[in-house]
Structures are given as structure tokens and as C-alpha cells.
Amino acid sequence: MAWDTARTRQALLDAAVDEFAEHGFDGARIERIGTRAGVNKERIYQYFGNKQRLFGQVLETELERIATTIPLTAEQAEDLGHYAGLLYDYHRARPQFIRLLHWEGLQDRGGPALKEPERTATYGSRVAALARTQRAGALDTGLHPEELFYAVLALAAWWFTVPQAVRMIFGGPSDPEAERASLIRLVRRLAQQGGSV
């Protein structure tokens, strides 16, 4: 029976997403990734070279996934609250992504990030969409488009970054539907003409 390299590689990537999200780069173990994937750990070295390259591939794959799943065009930017709701939904369904970014941030020493030029271009296209929408009069111009985009990213992710703060501030366990509705309302208010803080 032939070895299914594509399936094995994907199983390793899937297992690595969970391992790196749970433990970060330093805490992740190649042995656990192999065990989770049901594959000999030597396959990791065969397909990815080393742990650093595997982490890079995991992060790159997850970044591509969110970029293609939730694009932002000028038309979509007209309802920035809806976009924020989509981000919230994504983070809720795939919490590993935001955890991977936080682990990457904890390791940041000021040098270039993985695929930084490509990521900068992706962010830039979204900022440009917001700028076009602002020029068309559909969004508040009191904030720079970069500030507005960054605020939306932060607002959508923070619920999942510090769930303990959500419990303490809101006085109880998480209520995803209420959180999502609040986020959408807040971003719409922030983005509407005259809504800047």
C-alpha cells in the first residue's frame, strides 16, 4: 500500500496547530505532535525539516486561512460591524489562530516576523479598503484607516485573549451571542460618521 504523503503532511500540520496553540513554540514537543497525528515523529523532520520550520508552516497556513476566509473589500467595509462579527465567529470557531499569534508576539524581539512583507500587504489591502470607504463617505474619517482597522482586529480578538477579564467585567460566564452583538454594535458606532472617540 502506498504512503499517502499529502494526508500524512496534513495530519502533522493539524496536530502541530493544536500543539503550538496550547504550548507555544518553546513548550511544544515534536513527540506529542507525532503522537497526535498518529505518525512517527521522523516524518516531521522529513516533511518540515525542524521544529522552527514546522511552526512557520503552521503560522503561514493559519494566516492564509483567515485571509481567504474573511476578506475585506471596500463594499464589505461599509458595514464594518458585520466584518467584526465575522472575525469574532472565526476566532470562536478557531481559537488556535489567535493563540498562535499571541505566542508569536511573546517571542518577538523586534526583528522581522514570519512572512512579514506578505502579511503587511494583506493588512495594507484591508486598510486601503477602509480608506476608500472613508473617502466615499460611508465611514468616519476622524480615525486614520490604520487605526480603525487595528481597533476592529483588537476588539474582535480580545474576547478570546483574556476570557478571565470577560468574566470579571461582565460578571459571569461568557455569552457568545451577547458578546458578538455588543461587538457589532460597538464597531458600527465607532465607524459611523461622527462616531469616533
Q: Where are the predicted features?
A:
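C-terminal peripheral helix-coil segments that are non-catalytic and often amphipathic
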Residues: 89-93, 124-136, 154-197
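Amphipathic alpha-helical packing segments from all-alpha helical-bundle domains
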Residues: 67-70, 110-136, 146-147, 178-181
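N-terminal intrinsically disordered/low-complexity leader segments
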Residues: 1-7, 197
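Amphipathic alpha-helical linker/stalk segments
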Residues: 56-83, 117, 123-126
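Short coil/turn segments at alpha/beta junctions that flank glycine-rich nucleotide-binding fingerprints
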Residues: 22-26, 94, 136
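Helix-turn-helix
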Residues: 11, 15, 19-53, 57
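Amphipathic alpha-helical segments that line or abut small-molecule/effector binding pockets
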Residues: 14, 77-106, 120, 146-150, ...
